[in-house]
UniProtKB/Swiss-Prot annotation:
Residues annotated as the enzyme's active site: 52 (proton donor)
Catalytic reactions on record: prostaglandin F2alpha + NADP(+) = prostaglandin H2 + NADPH + H(+)
Site feature (Lowers pKa of active site Tyr) residues: 77
Entry's pH dependence statement: Optimum pH is 6-9.
Gene Ontology annotations of biological process type: D-arabinose catabolic process; prostaglandin biosynthetic process
Organism of derivation: Trypanosoma brucei brucei
Protein name: 9,11-endoperoxide prostaglandin H2 reductase
EC number of this enzyme: 1.1.1.-
Length: 276
């Protein structure tokens, strides 16, 4: 069964709320096989990036999976060193060639960077106008980055992909994005695996016959957040997709919300944005 529950972006494009994240999947057999498992398990949203160096693997899986292209939602991202107007256009062409696609569904600026994201966004707007991408967005942008972008853009970002999990619930940023009609996607939605044995999450899962991982993904989706768990394990990929047959209660959500500690497993965009 296709996992097609979707969220409508500000431009009307439908984006599946569950995606398959490809971070850290080795290019070649590992990434291609895992992506194929995900698609066969019903995933219709694939999330890769230039820096992951596995766009070609994603492309091979997409080409051979038997699912029509228009039924898949493919995201890739521009790396920091390619920011700037002309270099963005060039980098996009490299990505789309590696993917073997005529268009991507969502293209993201991976990190804010130092001082080029305005010019970079103008290139994104051109790609969008030229229908090479169906939606454009950002990743790891804080409120002040988005405010700066909104001062200069013709087309507002449709998505902001950020680190988000129970120890970093990003409530304020999520509320801000919602106020600007920007959808939020969670990367590292399971806290890079550190939270799958958490007793609080396991106790909640026990009520539904679900794992802590499934509870976290369900919590994100019920909060209106798109989530992209990564795994190279076929059983885990299937498990992560099996989250649409139960619903967390308000009390469950209160417990998970209460776990927030402002703890990042990934870099802080305020620091990493200068690291090219």
């Amino acid at each position: 069964m296709a996992l097609t529950q979707s969220l409508k972006l500000s431009n009307g494009v439908m984006m599946p709320v569950l995606g398959f994240g490809m971070w850290k999947l080795q290019d070649g057999n590992e990434a291609e096989t895992a992506t194929m498992w995900a698609i066969k398990s019903g995933y219709r949203h694939i999330d890769t990036a230039a820096i992951y160096k596995n766009e070609e693997s994603a492309g091979r899986a997409i080409a051979s999976c038997g699912v029509p292209r228009e039924e898949l939602f493919v995201t890739t991202k521009l790396w920091n060193s390619d920011q700037g107007y002309e270099s963005t256009l060039s980098a996009f062409e490299k990505s789309i060639k590696k993917l073997g696609l005529e268009y991507v569904d969502l293209y993201l600026i991976h990190w804010p960077g130092k001082d080029k994201f305005i010019d970079t966004w103008k290139a994104f707007e051109k790609l969008y106008a030229d229908k090479k991408v169906r939606a454009i967005g950002v990743s790891n942008f804080h409120e002040h980055h988005i405010e700066e972008l909104l001062k200069h853009c013709k087309v507002a970002p449709m998505v902001n992909q950020i680190e988000l999990h129970p120890l970093l619930n990003q409530k304020a940023l999520c509320e801000y994005c919602k106020s600007k009609n920007i959808a939020v996607t969670a990367w590292s939605p399971l806290g890079q695996g550190h939270l799958v044995e958490d007793a609080r999450l396991k106790a909640i899962g026990g009520k539904y016959g679900k794992t802590a991982a499934q509870v976290m993904l369900r919590w994100e989706i019920q909060a209106g957040v798109i989530t992209i768990p990564k795994s190279g394990n076929e059983a885990r990929i299937k498990e992560n997709g099996n989250i649409f047959d139960f619903e967390l209660t308000a009390e469950d959500i209160q417990v998970i919300d209460g776990m927030n500690a402002g703890h990042r497993y990934g870099p802080d965009p305020e620091v990493f944005m200068n690291d090219f």
